[in-house]
């Protein structure tokens, strides 16, 4: 009898030990619920922040930005700039390999920048690199980049999420299909991409930073509906969700297993007006529409208070941003201006949105109602990523159907040029970049160009202020709000957060 008891005890002990072992070695798998789908996994060919954020799973750049949007070294150790501002010499880290075993070195950097700066490749981010005259591999750990003209923000271009180092062997193997076959130096490598449902990445065993990554896998799952994203957190289907529906923030905050975070943002939301098309070619119409929108009410209705009314065309936290007296809500003034412009009974137009998630839908509905109060009938359309790429980003001025366009912008380089030039410079009309107002002003162009030729902060301040003064006066936009970034995560997930440009930082992420 004693022997039987002993045997049973051993069996029980064995089962308990097995269970403990399975718990101890349980895979650390994280699901991240995000607000829209991905367009490509090639950072050089992605126009949206989300696709580039997910690409950080595989890819790294020479430099990056920290949570305060300050420059940091990543694959580079240091850099120097020539006195004439034309030559950047970058020293690289040694001993790093791509996920396919290829060495990371100066030749790899050259291959990437040569590809990015070649207009024949028709990459969507070409404009970031068009000022590169040549890239030279001086030795395995030294790269020399020569510019066509001085560009004082160039090091920030190298820190942009688009400037990722892709394996040159993979570039040669996959060519234009590299967006489906990412191979970088990052902490994770591609496991599965179901293009309608999710991207799953797995730990890269050969990652160069000791002890990282700590997670075994991350699944990036697009969930357009705000309420569904929040519900996935509460049921444990997801461990991180962004953006969080503002109206549910208070509810999630009460959940003892979930941590809610509201973090600073450089995400500006606005409506551009196509100034090459009637009636938006009339400055009085554009002024009227700015008076027609009650921004403080919009903050409450669509953002549940997690935003601030815009006071300029550049978010205040970006260097050289200018703030102005906010547009007051004055529908009477709006109707007067419309009458003066020749539209006493208003007009009909279209209002498109770059996203189709629930918050965007609320902004569209609110704006539609506000415009109706001053006689403007707006037919609204909320686009998915594919529609946006085809109908907005892919068409030039003559064929574009854009009239009013609700979207957002975050200057992911952390500096003023990328907050202004892509959106207001004459040469940056779609399909080149994102000047969806098709705005053009020679003085603005000149001020922006001059600001890139000087390293003097006082002169930069003067030039960027002059450009913003003109833009604010001519009103090609209806500036709406600067968002606060509301995310939530399971309390056992650490080291995973939202960057001010709405990208993600997760290199230290862990499940406790």
Curated annotation (Swiss-Prot):
It comes from Escherichia coli O1:K1 / APEC. Its main location: periplasm. Residues 1-26 form the signal peptide. GO terms for cellular component: ATP-binding cassette (ABC) transporter complex; outer membrane-bounded periplasmic space. One of its GO terms (molecular function) is peptide transmembrane transporter activity. InterPro entries: Peptide/Ni-bd, SBP_5, SBP_5_CS, SBP_5_dom. It is found in: Periplasm. Belongs to the bacterial solute-binding protein 5 family. Part of the ABC transporter complex GsiABCD involved in glutathione import. Binds glutathione. This is Glutathione-binding protein GsiB. Keywords: Periplasm, Signal, Transport.
